[in-house]
């Protein structure tokens, strides 16, 4: 049996190809993909500007789907048939960064769609402990945004943002917008900086109080 997958063969060359149906290991789950986001790093892979990507590569790390087969180590609140989002950062759990909770800095980190094949294919396997259940009130097509949201929240947490503070955020792309809107939930005041006026106007429509065009 075969499934379709999105490959970047080399910079500037993308195609849909048939690949073998994945067979999971005991500690993996099998997931039927139903939505995937296109990240800036995917665009970088296509353009050849992402130095971490090797080719050919199945892209995709902002991915949601339905659990087809369960695996050992799966969170207790998840079962076959549930909608899940994957954590694309596969860490070893044994190195020093992992031992202090900085799994994103794992010395042996593998990011799906970057270092190893990703999830822009009809059916994928993924480590069973690295999936999260999607709340019933979140549409599948919106759920992939949870991954870039975690990037924005991580930045706010690392900066130790507190209520009443002003927060300068450089870049009004998806993650910058999420950081600005999240800062408001922390009762902080975001100042969003970009050189694309259209992005800044859109940010204002979303409720970002202060924007600055750095090209002015």
Residue ranges and their predicted role:
Residues 2-4:
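Extreme N-terminal starter segment of soluble prokaryotic enzymes
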Residues 10-12, 25:
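Residue-level recognition of beta-strand termini and adjacent short loop/turns
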Residues 13-20:
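Short glycine/threonine/proline-enriched tight-turn/helix- or strand-capping micro-motif at secondary-structure
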Residues 20-36, 49-96, 135-137:
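Glycine-rich beta-strand-centered segment in the early N-terminal region that forms part
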Residues 41-46:
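Cytochrome P450 core scaffold surrounding the K-helix E-X-X-R motif
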Residues 92-170:
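NAD(P)H dinucleotide-binding glycine-rich loop of Rossmann-like/cofactor-binding domains
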Residues 138-216:
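Mid-domain Rossmann-like dinucleotide-binding core that forms the NAD(H)/NADP(H) cofactor-binding site
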């Amino acid at each position: 049996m075969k499934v379709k997958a999105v490959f970047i063969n080399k910079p500037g060359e993308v195609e849909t190809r048939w690949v073998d149906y994945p067979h999971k290991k005991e500690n993996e789950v099998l997931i039927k993909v139903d939505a995937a986001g296109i990240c800036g790093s995917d665009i970088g892979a296509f353009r050849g500007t992402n130095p971490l990507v090797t080719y050919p590569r199945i892209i995709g790390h902002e991915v949601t789907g339905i659990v087809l087969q369960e695996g050992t180590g799966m969170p207790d609140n998840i079962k076959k048939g549930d909608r899940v989002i994957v954590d694309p950062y596969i860490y070893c759990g044994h190195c020093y960064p992992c031992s202090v909770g900085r799994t994103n800095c794992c010395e042996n980190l593998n990011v799906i769609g970057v270092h190893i094949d990703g999830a822009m294919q009809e059916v994928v396997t993924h480590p069973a402990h690295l999936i999260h259940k999607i709340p019933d009130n979140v549409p599948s097509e919106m759920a992939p945004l949870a991954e870039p949201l975690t990037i924005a929240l991580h930045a706010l947490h690392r900066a130790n943002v507190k209520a009443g503070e002003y927060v300068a955020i450089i870049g009004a792309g998806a993650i910058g917008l999420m950081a600005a809107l999240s800062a408001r939930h922390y009762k902080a005041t975001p100042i969003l900086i970009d050189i694309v006026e259209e992005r800044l106007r859109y940010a204002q429509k979303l409720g970002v109080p202060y924007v600055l065009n750095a090209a002015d």
